[in-house]
């Protein structure tokens, strides 16, 4: 009986966590006016939705969490919002919110364009274009899934 209760509690926690993350996509989308499909396309491209993903770049900076937030943002995130690197790695919703905030700022600076999407990952124009072309098929996949 105890084993069944533990299994039931574990299943309930997993369901509740999954529901909370699903709600997070909608909330962040509404907060920044960015489509869920676009946010998912970026999260898939950046990390395959892995919130424990960490990468070191050639310039020595690091990218963390599902949205691969670059370490160049860490000081500002902590100063303005109290968000630490550890919080990004521990909380998918916080990671998603910060990634959307970065993308939103790009759209404010560059307009709602593929260039703004490319700037999420790259500084130079040619790299922005390559990144945008990686996002496009993923975006179409998630748009199609929303239509079902």
Summary of predicted features, one role per range:
Residues 1-9:
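Bacterial N-terminal signal peptides that target proteins for export
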Residues 11-14:
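Short, linear, compositionally biased motifs with a strong N-terminal bias
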Residues 16-19:
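N-terminal signal peptide c-region/cleavage motif recognized by signal peptidases
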Residues 23-148:
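Catalytic glycan-binding domains that act on GlcNAc-containing polysaccharides
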